[in-house]
Amino acid sequence: MISNRRSAFALSAAIATLCFAAPATAAKFDGNWNMVLVTTNGHCGVIKMGMAVNGGHISATSGKFAMHKLALAGLISGSGATKINGVAGPRQAVGTGRFTRVKGSGKWTGTGPSGVCAGVWTALRTSTI
């Protein structure tokens, strides 16, 4: 009886580990990154921010635009492809691009009270988790 309980517990623990572990392919991008957005169309200027990647999920760690805290949400696939959504007060932006283990780059577009902006972004990894 005890042996069956131990086996059931071990099986449950193994299943939970498999179900909740981050995919290894997305985890290779985990860490802290510095990101810079440069405007090529519009009046949004240069935006610098910190971001974190955990299990392929992107979030902002620092940065402001027009006195509003920046918020990011996005995913990096196992191949490095990404789509990122950003918000700063009434302003919203969407970016796409690609990451490697040490850098990333892509394009973005945004809208806000002053109109439409677009540009390019780059990111450099500063540490791993």
Please annotate each region the language model reported.
Residues F20-A26:
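Sec/Tat signal peptide C-region and signal peptidase I cleavage site
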Residues A27-I129:
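Central antiparallel beta-sheet cores of small beta-barrel/beta-sandwich binding domains
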Residues I2-L11:
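Bacterial N-terminal signal peptides that target proteins for export
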Residues M1-I2, A24, W121:
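General helical secondary-structure elements
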Residues A10-C19:
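Bacterial N-terminal signal peptides
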